[in-house]
């Protein structure tokens, strides 16, 4: 065996024997870590005294033993062994340096650099220069290749710490000054700055955090004895807005928007352009409809109400109202403007009645309708349009279903059952025309007549005589027609109502 190898092995064994912590220790099988030795726990805590020249460790008992310092250890032939040196040096102490240049942080170094300046302010380039000149670790790291890392760390610390403030430099082309915050500032890092447009601004966050606290004061207290009917009962002033907002969102609106009062910008006063459905229904439905039975259709009830206000006036009042279309009705004894009603109840859908579109009527039927307590069936109240060729005749009311014995005073009778034509205006009665009396031979025929305003006949008038404004003798003088021809034409042509009153050759 080589004597050099034997010497190195002996020296290594001697060095390992110096540390008593590596001796075998007995412990129970249940323990995974050796128990503390009682002789180590009983030793005093005074540090040992070591003479640097002799390299001896002096114990409190007075005896000393020579030790080998790490600096005086002979190196083995194979070079230093890391395991042996680590065993000699032992674990690192708790007071070791935090960074490569020492225990000071970047912020502390920057603070020292700024405080060392005469004006207590430095530019970024001056801070770099102070670091390279003062701190030994950065002396050989001033070039551009090796300074990128620590210079970037300095810029981050200047921006993120509130103890440093940036002051504008008045000199042209110079960077800003960095100074210590006179208010002290926090030593820790400030939160990273965000863009002003982001939702995480501190002002909005403070407002959101305070909003729940203001909720009891914003909400109006309900009156005593009142019970809330809906979850949005407290927000009655939101008349135009939907009720889908929850209570918290509504509170946010009332908290952040108290100043806006215009209809364009304020949610609390915005009104819907649509009228409430209850108001529209209240205006469209007449008050008298509710007095009829529920089984009667509303349209028939409206027609009966119109019949209640029929006024039969003289013929001179017809010409003054020639511009009206439809029926102008006014209740007897009631003053005020006349209410104009469309003829959609009684006439087909072609349009309202105009001057010259006529029907036939009898005073008995009118009186029966006006004095009847029960509404007649819809088949008894019918209406039709007559071809415009009859523009010289006034507007007349056709009542179907009358008994065949009821004759008009002038000789015009109504058929019990009207005939149906294929067209929409299909109800045309069979008329038996009788020559008018000679007294009315010279009566002029008006060219255009307005819609008559009908009034009930007076008590003195005869029940069997037609009113003067409805007398057909004054309008139908020398009028000859073949009703068979008319009915056949109506049946053939359908909607095209073409009346021909010329006599056949």
Swiss-Prot record:
This is Forkhead box protein O4. Its main location: cytoplasm. The modification Phosphoserine is found at residues 197, 262. It comes from Homo sapiens. SMART domains: FH. It is linked to A chromosomal aberration involving FOXO4 is found in acute leukemias. Translocation t(X;11)(q13;q23) with KMT2A/MLL1. The result is a rogue activator protein. Residues 1-10 have a biased composition (Polar residues). Residues 54-64 have a biased composition (Basic and acidic residues). Transcription factor involved in the regulation of the insulin signaling pathway. Binds to insulin-response elements (IREs) and can activate transcription of IGFBP1. Down-regulates expression of HIF1A and suppresses hypoxia-induced transcriptional activation of HIF1A-modulated genes. Also involved in negative regulation of the cell cycle. Involved in increased proteasome activity in embryonic stem cells (ESCs) by activating expression of PSMD11 in ESCs, leading to enhanced assembly of the 26S proteasome, followed by higher proteasome activity. The keyword Cell inner membrane does not apply.
């Amino acid at each position: 065996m080589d004597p050099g190898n034997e010497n190195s092995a002996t020296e290594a064994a001697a060095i390992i024997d110096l540390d008593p912590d590596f001796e075998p220790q007995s412990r129970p099988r249940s323990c995974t870590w050796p128990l503390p030795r009682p002789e180590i726990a009983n030793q005093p805590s005074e540090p040992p005294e070591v003479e640097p020249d002799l390299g001896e460790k002096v114990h409190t008992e007075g005896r000393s033993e020579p030790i080998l310092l790490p600096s005086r250890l002979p190196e083995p032939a194979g070079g230093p062994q890391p395991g042996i040196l680590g065993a000699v040096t032992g674990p690192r102490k708790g007071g070791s340096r935090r960074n490569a240049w020492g225990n000071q942080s970047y912020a502390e170094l920057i603070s020292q650099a700024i405080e060392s300046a005469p004006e207590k302010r430095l530019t970024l380039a001056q801070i770099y220069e102070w670091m390279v000149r003062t701190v030994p670790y950065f002396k050989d790291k001033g070039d551009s290749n090796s300074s990128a890392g620590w210079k970037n760390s300095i810029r981050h610390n200047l921006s993120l710490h509130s103890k440093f403030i940036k002051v504008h430099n008045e000199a042209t082309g110079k960077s800003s000054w960095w100074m210590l915050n006179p208010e002290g500032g926090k030593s820790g890092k400030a939160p990273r700055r965000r863009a002003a447009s982001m939702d995480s601004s501190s002002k909005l966050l403070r407002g959101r955090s305070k909003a729940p606290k203001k909720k009891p004061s914003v909400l109006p207290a309900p009156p005593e004895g009142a019970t809330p009917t809906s979850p949005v009962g407290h927000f009655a002033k939101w008349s135009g807005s939907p009720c889908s907002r929850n209570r918290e969102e509504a509170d946010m609106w009332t908290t952040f928007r108290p100043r806006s009062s215009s209809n364009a910008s304020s949610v609390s006063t915005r009104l819907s352009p649509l009228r409430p459905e209850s108001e529209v229904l209240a205006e469209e439905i007449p008050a008298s409809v509710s007095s009829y039975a529920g089984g009667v259709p509303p349209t028939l009830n409206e027609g009966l109400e119109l019949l209640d206000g029929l006024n039969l006036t003289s013929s001179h009042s017809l010409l003054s109202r020639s511009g009206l279309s439809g029926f102008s009705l006014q209740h007897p004894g009631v003053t005020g403007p006349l209410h104009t009603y469309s003829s959609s109840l009684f006439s087909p859908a072609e349009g309202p009645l105009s001057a010259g579109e006529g029907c036939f009527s009898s005073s008995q039927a009118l009186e029966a309708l006006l004095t009847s307590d029960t509404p007649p069936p819809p088949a008894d109240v019918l209406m039709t349009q007559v071809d415009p060729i009859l523009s010289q005749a006034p507007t007349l009311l056709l009542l179907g279903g009358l008994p065949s014995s009821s004759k008009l005073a002038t000789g015009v009778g109504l058929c019990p059952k009207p005939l149906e034509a294929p067209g929409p205006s299909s109800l045309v009665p069979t008329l038996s025309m009788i020559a008018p009396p000679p007294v009315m031979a010279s009566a002029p025929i008006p060219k255009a007549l307005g819609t008559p305003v009908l009034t009930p006949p007076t008590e003195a008038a005869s029940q069997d005589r037609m009113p003067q404004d409805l007398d057909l003798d004054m309008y139908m003088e020398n009028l000859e027609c073949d009703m068979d021809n008319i009915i056949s034409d109506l049946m053939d042509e359908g909607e095209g109502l073409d009346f021909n009153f010329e006599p056949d050759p």
